[in-house]
From Swiss-Prot:
One of its GO terms (cellular component) is cytosol. It catalyses: Exonucleolytic cleavage in either 5'- to 3'- or 3'- to 5'-direction to yield nucleoside 5'-phosphates. Bidirectionally degrades single-stranded DNA into large acid-insoluble oligonucleotides, which are then degraded further into small acid-soluble oligonucleotides. InterPro entries: Exonuc_VII_S, Exonuc_VII_ssu_sf. Its EC number is 3.1.11.6. This is Exodeoxyribonuclease 7 small subunit. GO terms for biological process: DNA catabolic process.
Length: 87
C-alpha cells in the first residue's frame, strides 16, 4: 500500500471535518471499484467508509438543525434567495 493510501484511510477514531471525510470516501470508493485490493484491504476500507458515512450524516444533521434554528429565530421566518453581490 502506498503512503497516499495509508493517509487516506486514517484510524477510525480520527474523524476529519466534513469536506475531508467526503474526499476520503471518494478515494475509498475509487480504490474499491478498481478491484485490486485483497479481501482484508477491501474490508478495512469498507469499515472505514461506514464510519466516515456516519460522521458525514451526523455533520449534515447538525447543519440542518442549525439552519432550522436560525430560520426559527429570524424576524419574519422568510429567507430570500442568496445573492452574493448584496453587501
Amino acid at each position: 500500500m502506498s503512503e497516499t493510501d495509508s493517509q487516506e484511510t486514517a484510524p477510525q477514531g480520527d474523524l476529519p471535518d466534513f469536506e475531508r471525510s467526503v474526499a476520503e470516501l471518494e478515494a475509498l470508493i475509487e480504490r474499491m471499484e478498481r478491484g485490486e485490493q485483497t479481501l482484508e484491504e477491501a474490508l478495512r476500507d469498507f469499515e472505514r467508509g461506514i464510519h466516515l458515512t456516519r460522521h458525514c450524516q451526523k455533520a449534515l444533521s447538525a447543519a440542518e438543525q442549525k439552519v432550522a434554528i436560525l430560520l426559527e429565530n429570524s424576524e419574519d421566518g422568510d429567507v430570500g434567495p442568496f445573492r452574493p453581490d448584496d453587501s
